[in-house]
Regions:
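Aromatic-capped interface at the extracytoplasmic side
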Residues: 27-48
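Soluble "head" domains of membrane/secretory-pathway proteins
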Residues: 2-15, 20-22, 39-43, 50-226
Length: 226
């Protein structure tokens, strides 16, 4: 081996080693910062299906993994995790559909139930669904009506833009509903959740079916460079 060839090999090895060291330092710093901001949690149940736990077979099984940002502000349509007294078995994970000052209703129509926020239809559930879901929709609607009746004469109840009773979201409270809201215990039957009870916003979802490491790294890099 000539001196020139040997020098090229040494320089190449040094460059590769340096790149590995820089990458290792970068990843270490990234994970350190990440750990200071985020809380990791596994999701159980199907109240956020199909957004979460789409490939999970049992409600008792640990499904998708989420990373909860403790410091970000909360906006409509965010997914958040909260500790609430009416769900003692652990934290709940739901979507923010109502902000302070919003008016929330479920309206029964001939063929469907509409979840209405400030007069606008946010979600719909058909009455013509398969038997199980249709029954769940009906039961959930009846629970909502019971809850609304229990709140009568409370400051939490008002009149919506359509002239029908609505739930009013108070200051420093958020209205949380599961994406699979006919199979969810949430604000529609237990009321809005205090801002102080919200742990944080879900920024990263790692699906059970995905490669954990590469999915997490990809999500972290996306957050960093967006």
């Amino acid at each position: 081996m000539s001196y020139k060839t040997e020098k090229i090999l040494i320089n190449t090895f040094t460059a590769i080693t340096t790149l590995f060291i820089i990458a290792a330092i970068f990843l270490s710093l990234m994970f350190a910062c990440f750990g200071a901001i985020y809380i990791k949690s596994s999701v159980r149940g199907f109240s956020m299906y199909p957004t979460l736990n789409e490939s999970v077979e049992s409600a008792e099984q640990n499904g998708d993994t989420v990373f909860i940002n403790k410091y970000q502000s909360i906006n409509r349509n965010d997914i958040v995790v909260a500790n609430v007294e009416w769900w003692p078995s652990g934290a709940i994970i739901k979507r923010v559909v109502g902000l302070p000052g919003d008016e929330i209703q479920i309206l029964e129509l001939e063929t469907q139930y509409n979840l209405i926020v400030n007069g606008e239809v946010l979600y719909s559930r058909s009455k013509e669904d398969d038997a199980g879901n249709s029954l769940n929709n009906f039961i959930h609607y009846q629970k909502y009506l019971t809850f609304l009746s229990d709140l009568e004469n409370s400051e939490c109840v008002g009149v919506g833009q359509n002239g029908l009773p609505c739930i009013k979201v108070r200051e420093n409270e958020y209205f949380l509903v599961g994406d699979n809201w006919n199979n969810s215990v949430d604000s529609l039957t237990h009321g809005a959740v205090s801002k102080n009870d919200i742990i944080g916003r879900v920024d990263i979802i790692v699906k059970l079916k995905d490669n954990y490491f590469f999915s997490l790294i990809g999500s972290m890099l996306k957050i960093m460079f967006n």
